[in-house]
UniProtKB/Swiss-Prot annotation:
Keyword Metal-binding listed: no
Species whose genome carries this gene: Leuconostoc mesenteroides subsp. mesenteroides (strain ATCC 8293 / DSM 20343 / BCRC 11652 / CCM 1803 / JCM 6124 / NCDO 523 / NBRC 100496 / NCIMB 8023 / NCTC 12954 / NRRL B-1118 / 37Y)
Protein's name according to its UniProt entry: Homoserine kinase
SUPFAM superfamilies listed in its UniProt record: GHMP Kinase, C-terminal domain, Ribosomal protein S5 domain 2-like
Gene: thrB
Keywords attached to this entry: Amino-acid biosynthesis, ATP-binding, Cytoplasm, Kinase, Nucleotide-binding, Threonine biosynthesis, Transferase
Length: 292
C-alpha cells in the first residue's frame, strides 16, 4: 500500500494575492492498493463525487501518466471542499504524486511544482502544500520561482470555516477587472513589506500588514461577511492579523499561543454558523510512505 498525505493550505495571507501561502495541519490522505481492471475510488464525499476514472484525483494522475494501470484507491480528507483551504490543490497534488510513484517517473519537487502550478494556474496553494511551511511563489507561465517565508515559532491559526461553500469561480468573478497604477503600486508595496517583515521576524509589523490587503478582500467582503465580524472581535481583544483564507469563505486569525485561547473562547461563545479550529503550520508538506 502506498500512502500519500497532503496538507491543507491558506493562500494569500492577506495582501499576498496568488503568491503567498502556508500549509496547515489538516490533511487529505490517499491510499493506493492493488491493481484493478478499472479505477475504483472509495471516498465519503457522497454520490456527486465520481468513484471511477472520472474522479478528479484519477483524472489528474492520468494527465501526467496517461497509461497508468488502474488501482483501487481510498481517499480520506479533513479538508472541507470549497472553503478556501486548498482542497482542490491537495487533491491535485495527490493525483500527481500517485502518478509519479506508480509510473516510476521520479520527478523531483521542482518538476512536480511546475506541473501542479501549470494545472492550477497559480502557485500560492500548491507550493506550500508540496513543500510545507509558508512559501512565496511566482509563476511566469514556464517556471515557478519560490522561496520560504519565516513564521513565528509560537504561531497559531484560529480558523473559522463557515457552513457554506464558496466556489473559486464565484469568488474570482467578484474581483475588479483592473486597478489603477497608483493602487497597484500600493498593494504591491504592502505585500512586499509583509514578506520582508515575516522573514525579518518582525511579526508586529507583519500582523498589521496582513489586514491591509488592497487586491481582493474588499471585493469579496459580501461573500464572506464573517471576515469583518471576526476581525472586529479580535480588535476588541487587541489582536491583529485576521484575513480571508484564499478565495474564502474561511477566515483565519494569526495569533500567538498566549492569545489563541482568549480569542477562541470569545468566538466559541458567539456561536457563529460554522466550525472553529485551532491549527498549526505544517512544515513537512506532501509525504509518501510505502507499506508492503
Amino acid at each position: 500500500m502506498i500512502k500519500i498525505t497532503v496538507p491543507a493550505t491558506s493562500a494569500n495571507i492577506g495582501p499576498g494575492f496568488d503568491s503567498l501561502g502556508v500549509a496547515l495541519k489538516l490533511y487529505l490522505t490517499l491510499e493506493v492498493y492493488e491493481e484493478t481492471s478499472e479505477w475504483q475510488v472509495i471516498h465519503d464525499y457522497g454520490a456527486n463525487m465520481p468513484s471511477d476514472v472520472n474522479n478528479f484525483i484519477v483524472k489528474t494522475a492520468l494527465l501526467l501518466a496517461p497509461n497508468l494501470t488502474p488501482h483501487r484507491i481510498v481517499v480520506k480528507s479533513d479538508i472541507p471542499l470549497a472553503r478556501g483551504l486548498g482542497s482542490s490543490s491537495s487533491a491535485l497534488l495527490a493525483g500527481l504524486a500517485m502518478a509519479n510513484v506508480l509510473a516510476d517517473m521520479r520527478l523531483n519537487n521542482d518538476a512536480l511544482l511546475k506541473q501542479a502550478t501549470a494545472l492550477e494556474g497559480h502557485p500560492d496553494n500548491v507550493a506550500p502544500a508540496l513543500l510545507g511551511g509558508s512559501v512565496a511563489a511566482f509563476y511566469d507561465g514556464e517556471q515557478v520561482y519560490h522561496a520560504p517565508l519565516s513564521l513565528p515559532k509560537d504561531i497559531n491559526f484560529i480558523t473559522f470555516i463557515p457552513n457554506y461553500e464558496l466556489l473559486t469561480t464565484e469568488a474570482r468573478n467578484a474581483l475588479p477587472a483592473k486597478m489603477t497604477f497608483k493602487d497597484s503600486v500600493a498593494a504591491s508595496a504592502i505585500s512586499n513589506t509583509l514578506t520582508a517583515a515575516l522573514n525579518a521576524g518582525d511579526f508586529n509589523t507583519a500582523r498589521v500588514l496582513i489586514e491591509k490587503d488592497q487586491f481582493h478582500e474588499q471585493a469579496r467582503a459580501h461573500l464572506a461577511p464573517h471576515l469583518k465580524i471576526i476581525r472586529d472581535t479580535a480588535h476588541q481583544l487587541e489582536i491583529i492579523g485576521t484575513y480571508l483564507s484564499g478565495a474564502g469563505p474561511t477566515v483565519i486569525t494569526l495569533v500567538s499561543k498566549d492569545n489563541a485561547t482568549k480569542l477562541l473562547k470569545v468566538l466559541t461563545n458567539m456561536a457563529l454558523p460554522g466550525k472553529l479550529l485551532l491549527l498549526e503550520p505544517d512544515y513537512t508538506g506532501l509525504q509518501i510512505t510505502k507499506n508492503n
